[in-house]
Swiss-Prot record:
PTM text: Contains 2 disulfide bonds that can be either 'C1-C3, C2-C4' or 'C1-C4, C2-C3', since these disulfide connectivities have been observed for conotoxins with cysteine framework V (for examples, see AC P0DQQ7 and AC P81755). Contains 2 disulfide bonds.
Keyword Signal applies: yes
Keywords: Cleavage on pair of basic residues, Disulfide bond, Gamma-carboxyglutamic acid, Secreted, Signal, Toxin
Record's protein name: Conotoxin TeAr154
Presence of the UniProt keyword ATP-binding in the record: no
Expressing tissues: Expressed by the venom duct.
Length: 61
């Protein structure tokens, strides 16, 4: 029974802490979607290079 008030206080602090932004947004912040797009295009370019270069070296550029 002595742990219940401590548990309730910790629960309330945890729930209220989720809504607080830890770091304000700056102009340098980039959306995650652009990182995904860059990764996807890089992977596609590398896969194309791996698949065609042994057959046709002109596509390696």
């Amino acid at each position: 029974m002595h742990c219940l008030p401590v548990f309730v206080i910790l629960l309330l602090l945890t729930a209220s802490g989720l809504s607080v932004d830890a770091r304000p947004k700056t102009e340098d912040d980039v959306p995650l979607s652009s990182f995904r797009d860059n990764t996807k295009s890089t992977l596609q370019r590398l896969l194309k290079r791996v698949n065609c270069c042994p057959i046709d070296e002109s596509c390696c550029s």
